[in-house]
Regions:
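Short, conserved beta-strand edge motifs with alternating hydrophobic and charged residues
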Residues: 49-52, 74-78
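Active-site lining segments that contact anionic ligands and/or coordinate catalytic metals
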Residues: 70-74, 105
Length: 167
């Protein structure tokens, strides 16, 4: 599970903390792009690699079943953290859904040598996603444009992977 913070140590940034997200040691926001551990493991020979989200339980269940039959396997599951992210207690699933629907957390899997990017409709914007959490309260319009550019760059990279491995 990935909550993009070291919550037990006061919400320090991790390698997977999203760009511009405020952490306890970087109140102005993390400047580096996150590491994409699933892609690293895919290139390292894992038989099954996927991303998932608590907002899409049927997809998560399907991926867990697929991972159990292919070892080594890795699933990176987005799990929002209320203290680190700063959202209302009852909105964890909604925040997770916004991450997926805005493109900040793409869903994909690598199985049997095929990379498959899931086609999730973009019903939310990066601005919607950022507005759902206090860790992004400091962002300016320019910052939001940078986040949107990050999503575009990520979409482009993953699209090339899908075309290259599966086309």
């Amino acid at each position: 599970c990935d909550n993009q913070a070291h919550a037990a140590s006061g919400s320090h940034a991790t390698g997977t903390t999203q760009p511009l997200a405020r952490t306890s040691v970087r109140p102005s926001g993390k400047l580096r792009h996150p590491k994409h551990f699933p892609l690293m493991l895919m290139y390292s020979g894992a038989e099954y690699v996927a991303t998932a989200s608590t907002s899409h339980p049927a997809d998560l269940e399907r991926k867990i079943k697929a991972a159990c039959s292919r070892l080594p396997a890795f699933i990176q599951i987005l799990t929002p953290c209320n203290p680190s992210w700063g959202y209302d207690d009852h909105k964890g699933i909604e925040v997770s859904r916004l991450a997926v629907e805005s493109g900040m957390w793409p869903l994909y899997e690598w199985k049997d040598g095929v990379f498959q990017l899931q086609n999730i409709p973009r019903k939310a914007t990066v601005k919607d996603y950022a507005a759902s959490q206090r860790r992004y309260a400091h962002l300016t319009e320019s910052d939001l444009q940078l986040m949107q550019q990050y999503v575009g760059d990520l979409d482009s990279m993953l699209g090339k992977l899908q075309k290259g491995f599966s086309g």
